[in-house]
């Protein structure tokens, strides 16, 4: 799902009540803060725009209903801004508030709420794998209910979730999302498709990281064959093909390292067993020497 900032200026002035001077003053402050936020954000300055996003959100609380679309959009913008500024923990906290507002405004089965859950998952990805996975899964479930679990929308959001989780080293969790996406792409497009190749590459990379050489070989080979058959000249296809070939070329290296590691473990196990045997033998009590029998008493 492509993310776009939610613009508010087109309806702000029409929706704000300016009946009283105090409200007019707050409205002016709000619009100034939001314009500053939007301008700095468009210039790619999330850190500088952050204070204005927070000011706009705070001022809006006295101008709009707490469960209005405007408050939902402002909360979403602020949470995204925090994430862009590298403040993941604060972003995750704000997204939990955004989820509550979106649920009230749009309902529990809306595409909009799915987007919020997805970004909440992104914010938590490097902080808490369990919370991140839960948010992704909730968003994915909504998309599945709306478009169907065999739809390309469902495949796309699973692919995106898998990529984000794998980037944060949550590889085992990411594998499940990749496999869902792969099944749909293969059924829809076959092997010779960029999306199918992309998922095969990520699954090959996952098993490469876990030194599962034969499984990684299978997925990377599928990705390479699929990409070569496309004869794509675009940057994405070429970059993916180079990366897949690079990993594939290192599989023998990974196998050698893994085999040496396993041999070292075996040697260590043998040494530990030898030491344990020696310790058991040295701790056994020595046999008592023969004791002289007492002579019989004379009668």
Stretches found by the model and what they are:
Residues 1-299:
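Intrinsic-disorder-linked linear interaction elements in eukaryotic regulatory proteins
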């Amino acid at each position: 799902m492509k993310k776009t900032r939610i613009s508010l200026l087109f309806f702000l002035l029409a929706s704000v009540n300016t009946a009283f001077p105090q409200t007019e003053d707050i409205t002016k402050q709000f619009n100034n803060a939001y314009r500053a936020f939007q301008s700095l954000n468009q210039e790619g300055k999330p850190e500088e725009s952050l204070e204005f996003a927070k000011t706009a959100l705070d001022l809006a609380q006295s101008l709009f209903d707490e469960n209005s679309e405007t408050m939902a959009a402002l909360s979403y913008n602020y949470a995204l801004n925090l994430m862009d500024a590298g403040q993941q923990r604060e972003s995750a906290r704000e997204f939990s508030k955004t989820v509550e507002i979106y649920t009230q405004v749009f309902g529990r089965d809306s595409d909009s709420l799915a987007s919020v859950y997805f970004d909440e998952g992104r914010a938590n990805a490097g902080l808490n794998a369990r919370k991140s996975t839960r948010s992704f899964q909730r968003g994915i479930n909504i998309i599945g209910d709306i478009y169907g679990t065999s739809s390309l929308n469902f495949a796309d959001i699973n692919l995106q979730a898998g990529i984000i989780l794998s980037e944060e080293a949550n590889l085992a969790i990411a594998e499940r999302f990749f496999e869902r996406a792969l099944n749909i792409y293969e059924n829809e497009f076959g092997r010779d498709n960029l999306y199918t190749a992309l998922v095969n590459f990520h699954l090959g990379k996952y098993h490469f990281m876990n030194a599962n050489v034969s499984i990684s070989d299978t997925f990377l080979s599928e990705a390479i064959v699929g990409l070569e058959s496309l004869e794509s000249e675009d940057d994405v296809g070429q970059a993916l093909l180079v990366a897949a070939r690079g990993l594939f070329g290192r599989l023998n290296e990974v196998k050698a390292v893994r085999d040496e590691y396993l041999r070292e473990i075996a040697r260590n196990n043998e040494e530990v067993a030898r030491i344990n045997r020696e310790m058991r033998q040295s701790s056994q009590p020595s046999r008592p020497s023969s004791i002289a029998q007492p002579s019989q008493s004379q009668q």
